[in-house]
Design a protein with these regions (language model features):
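Short arginine-rich
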Residues: 220-230
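Predominantly a Rossmann-like dinucleotide-binding segment in NAD(P)-dependent oxidoreductases
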Residues: 2, 7-103, 231
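Glycine-rich phosphate/pyrophosphate-binding beta-alpha loops
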Residues: 66, 125-134
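Glycine/proline-rich active-site loop of Rossmann-fold NAD(P)-dependent oxidoreductases
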Residues: 105-106, 120, 133-136
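C-terminal lid/capping helical subdomain adjacent to the catalytic/cofactor pocket in oxidative enzymes
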Residues: 215, 229-238
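A general structural signal for well-ordered alpha-helical segments in protein cores
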Residues: 13, 68-69, 190-195, 221
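Hydrophobic residues in well-ordered beta-strands that form the structural core
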Residues: 1-3, 124, 150
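C-terminal glycine/acidic-rich active-site capping loop/insertion
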Residues: 81, 91-103, 111-116, 139-212, ...
Length: 238
């Protein structure tokens, strides 16, 4: 099985995770994430109005938040503690086609302060409704012996595009993405997910994150929601 957390399969993300796990930047100390998207802003096409409704389960926290926190875990380590705040900055959303309004029942801004099992602490500013030309993703990791940064500017968020890796330590260039043959940047990470699954099938292995990982991500998102709602730190135990 495979699930839709494709960002962790990006070759550049995998190289960043390798730099951390191999100790090239020393002991991971802290990280800072800024994750922005054009989506879930003050105006939306009517076909996406379901993303404003809590019952749909598809919203800024579950989509952009879920992908962002999964990348934190892919590069650093599983998250063990979470403090959070959420805000709905646009409680009334304009529907593009009709000019009418729809009530937004879900957050469009998420702030997370967390800690991973490796001991590294991190902050994540997860922001919706950013102008497309200003959208950015930045994931800065500081270690005891060095640093690395992952960046992207895809308007629909980090899960939808390629990334750039920089570091003060030398590293081999990331592998070429399997979906780099002109079929569009949004396919890069999904293509890598399928390639990983195919390798598993050929080898009789089960290394591609599946339903158990999806459950973990859902619990992570729920921990963010609970931390924001209760004002209490949440401890994650799988």
């Amino acid at each position: 099985t495979a699930i839709g957390l494709q960002g962790r399969h990006n070759p550049t993300v995998r190289r960043a995770a390798e730099l951390v796990s191999s100790g090239r930047i020393g002991r991971p100390l802290n990280a800072r994430v800024v994750a922005q998207t054009l989506a879930h802003g003050p105006e939306m096409p009517i076909q996406y109005d379901y993303c404003n409704k809590l019952a749909s389960g598809a919203n800024h926290l579950t989509i952009v938040g879920g992908h962002t926190l999964d990348l934190v875990e892919a590069v650093l380590a599983p998250i063990s503690e979470i403090d959070a705040r959420t805000e709905t900055r646009w409680p009334k959303v304009k529907l593009t086609e009709t000019g009418g309004e729809s009530a937004r029942e879900v957050p469009d801004w998420v702030g997370v302060l967390g800690k991973t099992r490796s001991g590294a602490v991190f902050t994540a500013d997860i922001e919706a409704g950013v102008q497309p030309e200003k959208v950015r993703f930045s994931f800065e990791v500081r270690g005891s012996e060095g640093w690395l940064t992952l960046t992207s500017t895809h308007p629909y968020g980090v899960q939808a595009g390629d990334l750039t890796l920089t570091s003060n330590v030398a590293f081999a260039p990331p592998e070429k993405a399997v979906a780099s043959g002109g079929i569009g940047e949004p396919a890069i990470n999904v293509g890598e997910l399928y390639a990983h699954l195919i390798r598993d099938m050929h080898a009789g292995a089960h290394t591609t994150p599946g339903f158990e990982h999806a459950l973990h991500n859902a619990r992570l998102i729920e921990a963010v929601r609970q931390a924001a709602e209760r004002g209490e730190r949440q401890h994650l135990i799988d």
